[in-house]
Amino acid sequence: LAEGGLVNRRDPFPGEPRWYQMTGKGLAHIGNPLPTPGVNLSEYKHDVGVAWLWLAARGGTFGPLAEIVGARRLRSLDGSRERGAEPAGVRLGGFGPHGRERLHHPDLVLRTADGRRVALELELTPKSRTRLEKILAGYAADPRFAGVVYLVESRAVARSVQAAARRLGVSDLVHLQRVRSTVSRSASKPALTAERAPGSRTRMPEAVR
């Protein structure tokens, strides 16, 4: 694939497994209309984790699904939608650059056969209180979403999400799942595995069971 120009081989960090990135030619070959993905090495761990989440969803971890949509596709849909059309992302209120309404795009959106949606957010680093509350308020105001699952690695991030959900009165909408990431420079097989926090009362939404 690399020799044919369909993917680029990359070795971003010494001692870390090589990874591959689709090229424009590769995307065209499989009929994918999305633009060539960019590279942000500061988000490497997050992006690899989301890829593992996508594979888990495709493999049935979250139950039968009609569709799995990633953030890149959501942003692409919103970038080309007509004025007045419903956005693919979650409305945050207000407008940003060029007069576009402010939107948040989940890492993954799982759609069940009956049309319900559940957002997956891989939250490896904390957001500011203001930013997090705006996102949760956006989910609460969007009737398309049956729930949002925050997959967190640290207890501090878990507490931050729980506290924000309580302040906004949306605890029933927000679900937490602890995960352990082996996406590191020493891991030969990067992965993302779920673990249940002791005493946790959170659960997956019924929409994806």
Question: PLM features: what roles do these ranges have?
Answer:
Residues R10, K45, R58-V118, L124-R131:
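Active-site metal-binding core of divalent-cation-utilizing nuclease and nuclease-like domains
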Residues L34-A51:
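A short, highly charged nucleic-acid-interacting micro-segment common to nuclease
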Residues P126-R209:
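Non-catalytic C-terminal interaction segments of nucleic acid-processing enzymes
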Residues G5, T61, P143-A146:
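Structural motif
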Residues L1-G38:
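Nuclease-adjacent, charged terminal/linker segments that flank catalytic cores
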